[in-house]
Amino acid sequence: MYKVFRIIMLSVMLCLCASPAWSQSNATKITWNGHAAFGITTPKGKVLMIDPWLRNPSNPAAKNKHDPVDDIKKTDYILITHGHFDHVGDSVELAKKTGARLVTNYELGTNMAKLLGYPKDQMGFDTLINIGGTITIADGEVTVHMTPAIHSSGLQIPNAGPNEPDIVYGGTAAGFVIKIKNGPTIYDTGDTAYFSDMKLIGRHYHPDIALINIGGHFGMEPDMAVMAAEAVKARYVIPHHYATFPVLTQDPTPFAKAIKKHHMTPVVMKPGETVTYEDGKLK
């Protein structure tokens, strides 16, 4: 009788472990690779890379002549907010290595394929959008909304000839709202300046996490970034786009202190650090 009971219990446990509800994690992982480069791994294991300038000087994986692109084994989608070199970054090499599809505006995607060699078959109307547009990717697990940004978007051509322009049209700069099933809603501002309609982004999408540029000079100064965070009202605020170059803000501490006064939680990450969002909490 005892043996029969053990067999029944073992069978029940095996069934539970095999069921999606038991085995599937609801954890979303966010890695900051320095500057504006983020990696997101969804609960189902899809990998999104945002503005993947992995070789930036803040990334510890780029130290001592090590190539951080070598460390990336999987990328399903590359999301690019605008055409500047520090956001296009290493996307072409990453795409050729992993087969990642490109999510960006149509003009930038087209020129990246023609002038930089991004594989043309790794983009299309399923991934190229414009401000106000929405796409669903990752087998329905991820929804991406392209939001406005006040910034420029020239695409730099490294091998331009003497009679050719060094910078070509890269569409309109943008931000992204990324909704992940069984995970967070993440708003990445891109390099935008503050604009009052950020309140509408917060009101409409209710982001759990905001990735906000604070570096100044080429984007929002920290005090303006605080206004942006207050407008969006995300529960967690992660600063980025700082301390990469001397002209940028070096210390995020004053920004983090101001965010606390607005009853939000600042999450100041170190380059290379990964945080996990699970059960409504970022840790």
Cite the ranges covered by each PLM segment.
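Zn-dependent metallo-beta-lactamase
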Residues: 2-47, 54-56, 63, 147-151, ...
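Beta-strand-turn-beta hairpins that frame and shape the catalytic cleft
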Residues: 24-28, 42-48, 134-144, 179-186, ...
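Pre-active-site segment of Zn-dependent metallo-hydrolases
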Residues: 43-85, 89-96, 116-120, 153-168, ...
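Conserved catalytic scaffold of divalent metal-dependent phosphoesterases
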Residues: 49-55, 131-135, 141-153, 193-194, ...
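Active-site neighborhood of phospho(di)ester-bond hydrolases with catalytic His/Asp-centered motifs
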Residues: 50-51, 75-83, 103-106, 186-192, ...
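Active-site environment of divalent metal-dependent phosphoester hydrolases
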Residues: 56-57, 85-89, 109-112, 133-135, ...
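Binuclear metal-ion centers of metallo-dependent hydrolases, dominated by the metallo-beta-lactamase
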Residues: 102, 116-138, 226, 230-283
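Active-site-proximal loop/helix segments of hydrolase catalytic cores
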Residues: 157-231
